[in-house]
Amino acid sequence: MGKRSDAAAPEPNLSRAEDLVLRMLSIPGGSGREGRVAEFIRQQLRRAGAPASSLRMDHSHKRIPQGGEVGNLILSLPGTESGPRRLLVAHIDPVPLCRGARPVVRGRFVVPASKSTALGGDDRAGATAILVAALEILKRGLPHPPLTFVWTVQEELGLLGARHLQIGLLGKPRLAFNFDGASPEDVTIGATGGYRMQVRISGIASHAGVSPERGVSAISIASLAIAQLHTEGWHGAVVKDGRSGTSNVGIIRGGEATNVVTPEVQVHAEARSHDPAFRAQIVGAIEAAFRKAARSVCNVEGACGKVEIRGRLDYEAFKLPEDHPCVLAAEAAVRAVGGEPQRAITSGGLDANWLTAKGVPTVSLGAGASGAHTTGERLNLAQFRQACRIALLLATAAEDK
């Protein structure tokens, strides 16, 4: 849109925004249990004047295999000005480490009161930033183009809310902005692709003291496979022939007693790369290592272990053109609040991966949360305020004023 010379660029009520983010951080509800925070957001929007007809919950949770309390919350507003529809999005589920978190303000930061929990700024801060934009528009009657706001669920389980988002409910947005990350000045225009795997290792149980030779240890199989991946450079940061990616064995479950040769182990792993072909090569190396290990662990009767491997693409890699309209709009908004935009490519997955794959090119900006997924997580209030200002500028198409 062109510049509007008849009105100043809008400024949000930042004191109210800080109060709101503290309330959002205090609401329990991890992945699949977002009902309370979704209802809180809905109530805030209704009290600000959003018509009931403008709010809906999609059925994404019914499409997700493990289910969930609610789907993605969607607010659709017709424009008071002409222009392409804009989408603002953020996820509302924190990681399990945030369970029991209580936010406290210490100086310039919001931190968890306990040293044993994370904070949940990832991504309650982003969810609050776009909520602030919606509330300011509703309460103040600010002019704006057609708008859609989405608060997604189950992002932390592999972008499941965005993956199963009913894209037809968004009103065909042309510009999309995802608030998730640390610095609001980081304009993320691309992200890696990720593949998730589950390996079921079947051995043979036996008494570990009386007849260990009759058993086939599933733990031994897992150990050999992981050791091979580590030794051959296929675990952790993976660099081969100028191509790069990552892999990780993140979950191992199995065993019930020390006097039993373990008959079954479940292993969960992932592989990531911006290069789909190289990511497939990493996946192949992981599969080969587990199959080889299973064949090599046998009992005295010649019976060996077995593996069953299942996997799925979590999200595909993407990179937007640097001159894409949503990239330029995001950078203009950062400059409008006195920042210096920095284009970035991330090795993490974002809701933007699936939105872009579904035909809605999306850039991502931070909302002030750093140290995500750790007990050292904190929310930089200055950056959060900046994110709120940027979100409102983008929602009102005033970033180029």
Segments (PLM) and residue ranges:
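Metal-dependent amide/peptide-bond hydrolase catalytic core
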Residues: M1-A9, V21, I219-K401
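A short glycine/serine-rich beta->alpha loop
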Residues: S26, K62-R63, V111-G121, S206-P212, ...
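Active-site metal-coordination/substrate-binding segment of hydrolases
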Residues: Q44, H61, P65-W151, Q386
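Acidic-glycine-rich active-site phosphate/pyrophosphate-binding loop
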Residues: D93-F109, T188-I201, A332, V363
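Glycine/charged-rich beta-loop-alpha catalytic/anionic-binding loops adjacent to active sites
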Residues: V105-T117, S202-S206, V337-G338, A369-H373
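Acidic/histidine-rich catalytic neighborhood of metal-dependent amide-processing enzymes
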Residues: K115-G194, V238-K240, T246-V249, T258-N259, ...
